[in-house]
């Protein structure tokens, strides 16, 4: 069995880790970094860039440089959070035919899982380069508060990237695994506060150790899937834009190029203000008007940034209270607080968390790498490489069906340990009703329409009977990935219907297969391009070395041979400008054939040079045989 890699597919950055023996190891990508920006760019010449190369060219290509795609994955276009992003993102978010949020890239409609798959492919390649063997299986992490549609969409992204997703696990749970695995922690209750680039989670986790076996049991989880570092950046960007407008009278919001530069500068300033009290946002030539170029130079203090984002930090406190309440614990029951996600480096976040829990958070967990390490550990558990670890996760939201009067009736309540299965018997609302519609919902609201609709299906063929008589058994079954399977059975007729919830939207099997094929075709064209470049380099080298040999041969090369070689060189030079690998190889072969006489001359010259240098060495050696004699002056005795 091959390695199961662990991938933290983040909103801002992604990370990949593997189990190396009993230790988890975070892998460096091709650029030498341990984390990869979750940025994908589609260039004008058809190239797809991922990570740092995509980030570097964002300023000149803002409309086709996609970031924070995780905020859109598994979401509907009409969702309030998506509509907020539509107005602030430089790229184009559109509604797909099925109502999902998709993207328009250079006139082509693309689904978020298809774009996230590019990041996963880079993670896969990073692991393959390190291991020297193909990787086909992965554990991928998601925010604990992701709903069913978002989890399913993440699995789809894995499939498009050529990975069999063996398990989807929650990010805070993964961080707890990373924290608890190599420590003699004994029995402890920990709080994992995970504030990443686009999502926020809090999980209360109990680690029990009995006879060397550790059980990680999630007691409760809560969060906000649209709160993260990107929102902090946006607050600072808006402040800078407003200040510039006050000063210069120009609104930069209409200039995508300026906004992209501003985004980079705001992110940099935010990071600097975690260690410094103030920083300068200095952007020369940010824009221009009739009077000439304009420059931005605005001082930002840590206090100013904190005042801009205070409500965002406070928004993360309410879920902490709910999670503790759901776990049946008080603040004093928490032994350790672990911070995960880059945004937790902000001093104000650390201070608020410390105030809430009444203790300083742990500093020995790397907030950028802990989640990927935990995913790799879970991969090790699945392959059997990691023993004595049991992970008990929970479903973050209640699951149920719509019943008479538009009410949500839960079958599985939130924070139920998964995998789990629950059945309940329902009946008809009308006399002689021959079919029922099972409308599956996820959420905590009493009114069905206020919850997330995950899908619906019909059970027909019910025998005619007075209302309330037929017995329809509805079964909810959640697997270890937190994905829901629903069945409904008429106990009288024995008729049954089953579905795996893929949300009322989501990608269908045909779309996923097409995207998998496209990804494979791209991989093939990438391989061909790489081979073409290698052949070009070989041809280029042959061209230069042959020209040099012709020069050195001088008059010793017969005129006929020289003409034939010149002609072959020109033919190769022309072929190198084209895209045909076979043509380049053929011209290289032709040049090699007509250059035989030249090769002989070159070899003779080389032999003569060697003989000459051997003679010179021999002469030097003779000179070396002369010994400097020592002598002393003898004075005559008088």
Swiss-Prot record:
One of its GO terms (molecular function) is ATP-dependent protein folding chaperone. UMPylation of the chaperone by YdiU negatively regulates its activity, facilitating Salmonella survival under ATP-limited conditions. CDD domains: ASKHA_NBD_HSP70_DnaK-like. InterPro entries: ATPase_NBD, Chaperone_DnaK, Heat_shock_70_CS, HSP70_C_sf, HSP70_peptide-bd_sf, Hsp_70_fam. Residues 603-638 are annotated as: Disordered. GO terms for biological process: chaperone cofactor-dependent protein refolding; DNA replication; protein refolding. Autophosphorylated; GrpE inhibits the autophosphorylation. UMPylated on a tyrosine residue by YdiU under ATP-limited conditions. One of its GO terms (cellular component) is cytosol. Keywords: ATP-binding, Chaperone, DNA replication, Nucleotide-binding, Phosphoprotein, Stress response. The modification Phosphothreonine is found at residue 199. Residues 603-620 have a biased composition (Low complexity). Induction: By stress conditions e.g. heat shock. Acts as a chaperone. NCBIfam families: PRK00290.1 (NF001413), PRK05183.1 (NF003520), prok_dnaK (TIGR02350). Belongs to the heat shock protein 70 family. This is Chaperone protein DnaK. It comes from Salmonella typhimurium (strain LT2 / SGSC1412 / ATCC 700720). The lineage of its organism: Bacteria, Pseudomonadati, Pseudomonadota, Gammaproteobacteria, Enterobacterales.
